[in-house]
């Protein structure tokens, strides 16, 4: 389930972002143009020779106004904390610098796999210059040009060779979930409170592909859960811990590892832009989503309308998460925390739900009878049949005479009718229009 993480590290102007975009290529998917669904390129999914992985551009993380060398060191620390493999990018035009040497020493001591990319080797004459980089003690330097795509195959071959073996995780039958959100919404308190409620902790196990600690526990009814990356949430004192981009990156990593994500909001502070960015990534990833409003106990002037008003605000600001259940909790007083495991399990089951084709088509035909298909330029959309082709998230192919005739509003109507007929609360569902051959 969890993709390996590759971090790109290096001093400014060596071409980190260009290399990042070259590897990510067109694989950064834009699902829909919806307000709040961000397109930040600090994090992307990529693939090479059938190996899927996630990339983080540490250079995109804003780390205060520290001196340059301090910033680069902090990039290296982030990469060491988060990544399975590190691409250290240097620049053939400037040769080996003091900054390169200091960061190389940090990376070398980390015992994390490091692949050294010497960038801007735009012509064969520059290839001989890369041998100076053996002095960094990081093994073979790979000559690349991220602008022209030269040497990318050899570089990526070296990267995927370092990926960890995930085979040991195949038999894990627990539900993986995580709390995600911006700093100071109470994720750490929720983690501790949940583990306090569920005292039967099975084990603390090393994460599948990295050093983070995932906590497994079992509820009284025997359901097994794995809380993803609790160690990462508990880490304190890092100079970059409260930067927005680092928080966003950590959330995206947790999303990758989870069946269900719990987007945590702070009842005291309301909804911020970063909340919407993080929730947008959860939506795009296609995992199960629950919205958790924490610190509900801190609102002193509550009445019977307060929860309704806050719910309406969430539905307005997170329109793309209309399917996500909302729960109001307090990590401090334990209010409603006992409901969370059951809600997580429910969303997990909806995320894996499969509908028989005959039953699905009855729903589609009833929907079309109640609201006939639209016409465009004298041509009417014809819906022949539908079938479910995947779960996690549930994905349906709808066979039609011409996909161009399926207006977005009618597609949304069909989705709503499917949701009315079957309980898919907490999970996105995808409809794919396909022309019948």
UniProtKB/Swiss-Prot annotation:
Keywords, ordered alphabetically: GTP-binding, Nucleotide-binding, Repeat, Ribosome biogenesis
Gene behind the chain: der
Family: Belongs to the TRAFAC class TrmE-Era-EngA-EngB-Septin-like GTPase superfamily. EngA (Der) GTPase family.
Entry keyword Nucleotide-binding: yes
Keyword Protein transport among UniProt keywords: no
Functional summary from the UniProt entry: GTPase that plays an essential role in the late steps of ribosome biogenesis.
Organism whose genome encodes this protein: Limosilactobacillus reuteri (strain DSM 20016) (Lactobacillus reuteri)
Chain sites annotated for binding GTP 2: 181-188, 229-233, 294-297
Official protein name in the record: GTPase Der
Molecular function GO labels: GTP binding; ribosome binding
InterPro entries: G_ENGA, GTP-bd, GTPase_Der, KH_dom-like, KH_dom-like_a/b, P-loop_NTPase, Small_GTP-bd
Domain called KH-like: residue spans: 353-437
